[in-house]
Amino acid sequence: MIKSNLVISSLAIVSSMSYAGVEFSNPSGQLGEPANYTQFANILSASELQISDPNGKKGNKEYFALDNDFTGIVNDNFYVDKQSQALVFKMANDHLRNELRVQKNFRTDLPDHFYTLYANVEILHPLQSMANSTSKQNEITFLQVHNKGLDDQGTHNVPHPLLRVVWKENNQGVKGHFWAITKNNAVICKGSFGKKNKDKEMCRADVAYSKIDLGPAPTDKGTDFTITVGNKTLAIDVNGQRKVEKNIDYWRHLLSYFKAGVYNQFTQGESEAHFNQLRYQVNTP
């Protein structure tokens, strides 16, 4: 229900619970508990929650609902807004996250297997979130296609996502737009395994990555995103228009998965994303 290595039989009846700095509580009942909203049953039944302690060290995260049971999983960072019925993700501080991780690890090369993530998302007050940031990046990542590695055990995982969909404050003078940031190869360019590659041309930012402008981010409504992976292709539709269709044959040896929520790449602020819709779909023979 909460964490796979915790055995807490009375968890569903307590009003507050915590682990390693992450606390779930809803004492006044003002927050909507995501498990109680049928419109999010599809995504919750396929996902676990990966969430940081906002007061913890950079990069920290804990794992919850590994059995897809989100009963009692609600706090000021993860809840449903009772008025708008949106699934809300919040997180403070740099390189911290609050994301649903779809548990299925899938092949990207099969010609008749397609994996799709649908989302209608509004990023709330991002400029205010970054008003005091000292980062040069100033991004909020809210959708991802990442990889597990060669197998479900995580062998030879590549520590770079295939895709990040971000709100970016400023990209060479283009302000307040959504961007698709895609990895153009499967080369490891950081960490101990990336030391031999990091200074090579294939790890240069302009070679290893592409940034595709997905258009200005509205400040008063959500935006529809459809991400589909299959048949060695990554496709992204925004408000029903195809924005990206990319051959990803170079990714075929890696098992991939979806993530949705918020991942901060800015300092001294808090991100907030409202998902009016969030669904996962698999089309196979």
From Swiss-Prot:
GO terms for molecular function: poly(beta-D-mannuronate) lyase activity. Its EC number is 4.2.2.3. It holds the Pfam family Alginate_lyase2. Residues 1-20 form the signal peptide. Keywords: Lyase, Signal. It is an enzyme of class 4 (lyase). The keyword Signal applies. It catalyses: Eliminative cleavage of alginate to give oligosaccharides with 4-deoxy-alpha-L-erythro-hex-4-enuronosyl groups at their non-reducing ends and beta-D-mannuronate at their reducing end. The keyword Plastid does not apply. Belongs to the polysaccharide lyase 6 family. This is Alginate lyase.
